Amino acid sequence: MKPNIHPEYRTVVFHDTSVDEYFKIGSTIKTDREIELDGVTYPYVTIDVSSKSHPFYTGKLRTVASEGNVARFTQRFGRFVSTKKGA
């Protein structure tokens, strides 16, 4: 491999702010922020969603009631369609 073309691979702390969890993961992400954990200073990155907070991984899925095409049509355009027969 060519020297000096690969990014620096290092341990980085990712902070999931929605559940206040910290993850130490190897990464090449660049950041100017740092945090000290366990007496060691690491690069620090905040994230909004991780496997600890995403509904798919936590099992707290939101269920969306599925409607048929006719029900959706009636909901959207029902006010324009006359309900009187033989008019």
Curated annotation (Swiss-Prot):
> Which of UniProt's keywords are assigned here?
Ribonucleoprotein, Ribosomal protein
Q: What induces it?
A: Maximally induced 30 minutes under zinc-limiting conditions, still induced in stationary phase; repressed by the zinc uptake regulation protein Zur. Probably part of the rpmE2-rpmJ2 operon.
| Single Gene Ontology BP annotation | cytoplasmic translation
Q: What InterPro entries does this protein's entry cite?
A: Ribosomal_bL28/bL31-like_sf, Ribosomal_bL31, Ribosomal_bL31_B, Ribosomal_bL31_sf
Q: Pfam families, per this entry? A: Ribosomal_L31
Recorded hits in PROSITE patterns, A to Z, give: RIBOSOMAL_L31
- Consequence of gene disruption: Grows poorly in the absence of zinc.
Write out the GO cellular component annotations.
cytoplasm; cytosolic large ribosomal subunit
Q: Does the keyword Ribosomal protein apply?
A: yes
Electron transport listed as a keyword? no
Which GO-annotated molecular functions does the record name?
structural constituent of ribosome
Q: How does it assemble?
A: Part of the 50S ribosomal subunit.
Q: Which family does it belong to?
A: Belongs to the bacterial ribosomal protein bL31 family. Type B subfamily.
- Tell me what this protein is called: Large ribosomal subunit protein bL31B
- Native organism: Escherichia coli (strain K12)
The organism's lineage? Bacteria, Pseudomonadati, Pseudomonadota, Gammaproteobacteria, Enterobacterales
